[in-house]
Amino acid sequence: MVREKVKVSTRTLQWKCVESRRDSKRLYYGRFILSPLMKGQADTIGIAMRRALLGEMEGTCITRAKSENIPHDYSNIVGIQESVHEILMNLQEIVLRSNLYGTCNALICVQGPGSITARDIILPPSVEIIDNTQHIATLTEPIDLCIGLQIERNRGYSLKMPNHFEDGSYPIDALFMPVQNANHSIHSYGTGNEKQEILFLEIWTNGNLTPKEALHEASRNLINLFIPFLHVEEETFYLENNQHKVTLPLFPFHNRLVKLRKKKKELVFQYIFIDQLELPPRIYNCLKKSNIHTLLDLLNNSQEDLIKIEHFHIEDVKKILEILEKNRKFISN
């Protein structure tokens, strides 16, 4: 456990971790301060951060399990102590950490007798288990058991739909919430017009993220929500039939490339892969996930299409514009 004395700055706004500990493999705690704040600011930031921590964070869970010859999820299998339902509940509790986008597959393939734990899950390189000792099932006889797993990274929660079983696979309720709890408190000091505040923020996580990582990610998510307001002067807002609509900034370089494409350049664009553009990893992964592999694929999508891509923001579109402008000569030749 790490604990530090609280020192209040009278000058620059700063944050600091004043306590950090790991209570167990699946329970981390962190306590942070932000100061000095003007009266009222601590509550504004504290409420926003708590909501971002509890509602906007992404997590990784097992969302589906598949094994042959299982009639329904409340059945029992000879040679296995637990029912299928109990095994699914145990899989639901497995805490994973990953940097993947979307879904991936994993596998359990063991021979009894013996105990099956999270250590027996064969995972892709992008996923790791927080607690290898988590129990899954007990094999009481020398039988072979193979279970295919689907792993997904998402936010919020996902409830399985009744009768929604595909090819003998069973959906698992998933809670994509690495932050188990978050609280904030305020300490006021000073008098009169010089009254200031210290914000205390407490974060508990399940090990998918550390409290410090959760604080950073929640902060980034909040910043991304407000970025469009910083560029409001670049956008045209208007009302039509009582509906609010937004017209995005022009895509000048896109128009220039469209002209090139009309000059028989389309074949060239088909063989310029986005790998060659040196895009940031997150933007690159989002484009690949949306089946955008070449410059031609990219140009066939409008700005509005790109904004609709999951986890994509207007700042990402502007970043692509900057990179295309930087590579103008390479693309135009």
Curated annotation (Swiss-Prot):
Subcellular location: Plastid, Chloroplast
HAMAP family listed in its UniProt record: RNApol_bact_RpoA
SUPFAM superfamilies: C-terminal domain of RNA polymerase alpha subunit, Insert subdomain of RNA polymerase alpha subunit, RBP11-like subunits of RNA polymerase
Enzyme Commission number: 2.7.7.6
Keyword Flavoprotein on entry: no
Listed SMART domains: RPOLD
NCBIfam families: rpoA
UniProt cross-references to InterPro entries, sorted A to Z: DNA-dir_RNA_pol_insert, DNA-dir_RNA_pol_RpoA/D/Rpb3, DNA-dir_RpoA, RBP11-like, RNAP_asu_C, RNApol_insert_sf
Location of region: Alpha N-terminal domain (alpha-NTD): 1-233
Region (Alpha C-terminal domain (alpha-CTD)): 267-333
UniProt subunit comment: In plastids the minimal PEP RNA polymerase catalytic core is composed of four subunits: alpha, beta, beta', and beta''. When a (nuclear-encoded) sigma factor is associated with the core the holoenzyme is formed, which can initiate transcription.
A GO BP entry: DNA-templated transcription
Main function: DNA-dependent RNA polymerase catalyzes the transcription of DNA into RNA using the four ribonucleoside triphosphates as substrates.
Catalyzed reactions per annotation: RNA(n) + a ribonucleoside 5'-triphosphate = RNA(n+1) + diphosphate
GO cellular component: chloroplast; DNA-directed RNA polymerase complex; mitochondrion
Family membership noted in the UniProt record: Belongs to the RNA polymerase alpha chain family.
UniProtKB keywords: Chloroplast, DNA-directed RNA polymerase, Nucleotidyltransferase, Plastid, Transcription, Transferase
One Pfam family recorded for the sequence: RNA_pol_A_CTD
Residue ranges the record marks as coiled coil: none
Source superkingdom: Eukaryota
Broad class of where this protein is predominantly found: plastid
Any one GO MF annotation of this record: protein dimerization activity
Official protein name in the record: DNA-directed RNA polymerase subunit alpha
Domain notes: The N-terminal domain is essential for RNAP assembly and basal transcription, whereas the C-terminal domain is involved in interaction with transcriptional regulators and with upstream promoter elements.
